[in-house]
Amino acid sequence: MFYLNAHLEINKVVDVVMSLSKKFLKPSVASNQLRLLFTAAERKVNYPGHVPLSPLQRIFLVAGSAIMGLKAPWRGGDMISVLGDASGQPFFLHRLLNKMLVDKTGREILKDKPRMTSKSLNLPFLRTLPPNTLGKIYVDWIDKEHVGPDTRSPTRFVDDPEEAYVMQRYRESHDFYHAICNMPTNIEGELAIKWLEFVNMGLPVGALSALFGPLRLNCEQASRFRRVYIPWSIRNGLNAKTLINVYWEKELTNDIEDVRRRIRIEAAPPLV
């Protein structure tokens, strides 16, 4: 029911965006260039599920999803995903794609284009691994937090297929950041990971969550977050390998301390 309601809210925001763009458009006086600014009718669908947007529609969608994401951060998964799609173009996703293209593992990921699902990750197998392995720690973490790899929204509003995959990979890797850093999914844990993602990869959706999310913390939580977790996130975000270039599926049987050492990331201070 939660998942359905989240998607209904997304569709509501998208419907408002489309109707506003039509309201602003006056065909009798608009030039062809102006029409292209307001309407996506001339734009082609580039991959299954792609929703083309005009520049104005993209602005509306960024604003609407940002407001909804801030209003209800506990539902942030789907609405923040829309914000990530809409705000990543035209600069930020292209820059992240370039970071993958200049990295050997990044190029391998782009060539293979793996998707993370319960089936592809083989969760029953991960439960049989030794307790010190990344795979075992990951599957224990998702069991404890009651999350899973099948709940990530598909990319819809990114025009370029390669950049759309980069956004999908960014989204699907999120739980591995939690698991390898030993960070829960409560508000403080999510914000710490968003700070880490923003500093490390620079997508604006991370900046929005990182900058405005702490407003949802009480005084004690906010003080601890400023003293402990923001410094941890910034230090690790700057020091770590670009996390989009980690081929998590090939690290599952490896010792987690070895993985942390190679990607230069620390476990977070315990969040209790």
From Swiss-Prot:
GO biological process, one term: ubiquinone biosynthetic process
Annotated binding of Zn(2+), by residue: 174-175, 178, 190
Cofactor(s) it depends on: Zn(2+)
Places the protein is found: Mitochondrion inner membrane
Membrane topology designation: Peripheral membrane protein
Family annotation (InterPro entries): Coq4 (IPR007715), Coq4_euk (IPR027540)
Enzyme type, top EC level: lyase
GO MF entry, a single one: 4-hydroxy-3-methoxy-5-polyprenylbenzoate decarboxylase activity
EC number: 4.1.1.130
Keywords linked to the UniProt accession: Lyase, Membrane, Metal-binding, Mitochondrion, Mitochondrion inner membrane, Ubiquinone biosynthesis, Zinc
Matches recorded under Pfam families: Coq4
This protein's pathway: Cofactor biosynthesis; ubiquinone biosynthesis
The organism's place on the tree of life at top rank: Eukaryota
GO cellular component: extrinsic component of mitochondrial inner membrane; mitochondrion
Primary site of residence: mitochondrion
Catalysed reactions, semicolon-separated: 4-hydroxy-3-methoxy-5-(all-trans-decaprenyl)benzoate + H(+) = 2-methoxy-6-(all-trans-decaprenyl)phenol + CO2
PANTHER family linked to this entry: UBIQUINONE BIOSYNTHESIS PROTEIN (PTHR12922), UBIQUINONE BIOSYNTHESIS PROTEIN COQ4 HOMOLOG, MITOCHONDRIAL (PTHR12922:SF7)
Other noteworthy facts: This protein may be expected to contain an N-terminal transit peptide but none has been predicted.
Family affiliation: Belongs to the COQ4 family.
HAMAP family registered for this protein in UniProt: Coq4
Record's subunit section: Component of a multi-subunit COQ enzyme complex, composed of at least coq3, coq4, coq5, coq6, coq7 and coq9.
Described function: Lyase that catalyzes the C1-decarboxylation of 4-hydroxy-3-methoxy-5-(all-trans-decaprenyl)benzoic acid into 2-methoxy-6-(all-trans-decaprenyl)phenol during ubiquinone biosynthesis.
Protein name: Ubiquinone biosynthesis protein coq4, mitochondrial
Organism, scientific name: Schizosaccharomyces pombe (strain 972 / ATCC 24843)
